[in-house]
């Protein structure tokens, strides 16, 4: 009799454990499902989204930094996807701005801007530095033979990707003497998620060590600053939190790239891009 009772209890305990296990699996599936609903954006798309005026659908006419910032985003995105690396340091080439960008893999990504850049790099001999590539992709070169490397209509092509992902829409607006295609934000939830991520990285989730930060978040902070759109992400903050976010972002961006780029777990390309913008 006692044996039967024990077996019955074991059976009940086993059922409870299975039920708990099934609940935990269900919870994990729900979390995965929630994660899968998040739209995957490239760094270039995130920078442009931060720079766009929500209702007007265009970037500030006074912003002359975003073009080069988007090109820097292309280089970091290629690095994070394993397509490019920086050449190893030598006695003569210790500084990040002196290192050449080497093509690690010419496998295409499916993103037109990234793939166009891969093709340019594959056809370039000798290799170029990070700063040179930013200038070439922007078209800021005095060498007429290298104008072919300029990426054209970059903002419009990135905006088109965001339209396809359901974040922007396309409209025509009349500006006195000309019509302009604009891309107002329709998915404000996605932009708010992006803004919240940047705010939290400098406030609630501040780690005071760039090498412990998520690499894509660190890259976005660098690119948003270089593109002069970082303050856009802080406009909704209270004065106290705004000041704190600005102080911490300045501390982060004032770090010496050549020193940070050699530390363990450092993402060299992020610091190389920051160094290139500091130098320009």
UniProtKB/Swiss-Prot annotation:
GO MF term set: phosphatidylinositol-4-phosphate binding
Pfam families cross-referenced by the UniProt entry: GPP34 (PF05719)
Biological processes, Gene Ontology terms: Golgi organization; Golgi to plasma membrane protein transport; Golgi vesicle budding; positive regulation of protein secretion; retrograde vesicle-mediated transport, Golgi to endoplasmic reticulum
Chief subcellular location: Golgi
InterPro entries: GPP34-like, GPP34-like_sf
Record's bilayer topology term: Peripheral membrane protein
Positions bound to a 1,2-diacyl-sn-glycero-3-phospho-(1D-myo-inositol 4-phosphate): 62, 71, 152, 155
UniProt keyword terms in alphabetical order: Golgi apparatus, Lipid-binding, Membrane
Cellular compartments per GO CC: cytosol; Golgi cisterna; Golgi cisterna membrane; Golgi membrane; trans-Golgi network
Family: Belongs to the GOLPH3/VPS74 family.
Subunit note: Homooligomer.
Function summary: Phosphatidylinositol-4-phosphate-binding protein that may play a role in the process of vesicle budding at the Golgi and anterograde transport to the plasma membrane.
Name by which UniProt lists this protein: Golgi phosphoprotein 3-like B
Naturally occurring in which organism (per UniProt): Xenopus laevis (African clawed frog)
């Amino acid at each position: 009799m006692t044996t039967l009772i024990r077996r019955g209890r074991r059976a009940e305990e086993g059922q409870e454990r299975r039920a708990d296990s099934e609940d935990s699996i269900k919870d994990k599936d729900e979390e995965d499902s929630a994660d899968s609903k998040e739209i995957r954006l490239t760094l270039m798309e995130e920078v442009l989204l931060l720079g766009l005026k929500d209702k007007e659908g265009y970037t500030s006419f006074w912003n002359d930094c975003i073009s080069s910032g988007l090109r820097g985003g292309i280089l970091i995105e290629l690095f994070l996807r394993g397509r490019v690396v920086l050449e190893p340091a030598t006695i003569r080439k210790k500084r990040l701005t002196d290192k050449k960008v080497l093509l690690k893999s010419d496998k295409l990504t499916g993103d037109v801007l990234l793939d166009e850049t891969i093709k340019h790099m594959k056809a370039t001999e000798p290799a170029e530095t990070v700063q040179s590539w930013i200038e070439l992709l922007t078209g800021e070169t005095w060498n007429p033979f290298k104008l072919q490397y300029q990426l054209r209509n970059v903002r419009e092509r990135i905006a088109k990707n965001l339209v396809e992902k359901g974040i922007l829409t396309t409209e025509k607006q009349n500006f006195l003497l000309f019509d302009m295609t604009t891309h107002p934000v329709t998915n404000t939830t996605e932009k708010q998620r992006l803004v919240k991520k940047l705010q939290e990285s400098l406030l609630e989730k501040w780690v005071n060590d760039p090498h412990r930060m998520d690499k894509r978040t660190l890259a976005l902070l660098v690119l948003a600053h270089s593109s002069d759109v970082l303050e856009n992400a802080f406009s909704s903050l209270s004065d106290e939190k705004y000041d704190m976010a600005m102080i911490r972002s300045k501390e982060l961006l004032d770090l010496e790239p050549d020193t940070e780029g050699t530390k363990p777990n450092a993402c060299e390309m992020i610091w190389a891009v920051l160094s290139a913008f500091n130098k320009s």
